[in-house]
């Protein structure tokens, strides 16, 4: 079965005090919606749309994103991404980002739902200049749990690399197989249908911020952890509530993003659920 071969190439530049997309090439099913500026001209919010409504076996999606110096870009998606399990061939998605000095990329897609039988492989590579930063998260639901579906076949692979000045800052490889062992093992899902990872990479995170990240997770019913990197921090979640996961990640994101002290967040991206 032939799937989509979609491409998206975005280039952002700093022009007269504003971050603007100066190149936006897209081929179906990927599309860039109109950019907007709820926080003012320096920070560009862009929404990447998948016009086919979900991924099916055989899809190959490639995205390349470049931020020129001083740009601030937040990229998200308009809704949950669905990976269907209808064909026994994998879906592959790759994302390669180049972030120049004094630029900040925020890669914050809404959650991904992996249907039973789906085979999904995502590769993410981010190259940072010495004074660049990136914030990113991934929220994944295994199976359509509202229908009682269990992720008992298929697989999910998530491979992330963040480099700065040619030095690896964070290499993260995760793999979940749709087997009983993976569903129940302590070092896998342990009966939880949700996993999430949030990272901020490219600068040192203070011990006070680390403690505040942990304090923000107080009262969470799922399991959480906060780990430091040489230049960054990683937060992880495993549990049953997407609302709980999203609430913690949004609070952590607001704490970590630069400029929050003097430039408080005006509003969430308009496509996010309230």
Swiss-Prot record:
Belongs to the UreD family. Required for maturation of urease via the functional incorporation of the urease nickel metallocenter. UreD, UreF and UreG form a complex that acts as a GTP-hydrolysis-dependent molecular chaperone, activating the urease apoprotein by helping to assemble the nickel containing metallocenter of UreC. The UreE protein probably delivers the nickel. The keyword Chaperone applies. Its main location: cytoplasm. It is found in: Cytoplasm. It holds the Pfam family UreD. One of its GO terms (cellular component) is cytoplasm. This is Urease accessory protein UreD. InterPro entries: UreD (IPR002669). It comes from the Bacteria. It comes from Thermosynechococcus vestitus (strain NIES-2133 / IAM M-273 / BP-1). Keywords: Chaperone, Cytoplasm, Nickel insertion. GO terms for molecular function: nickel cation binding.
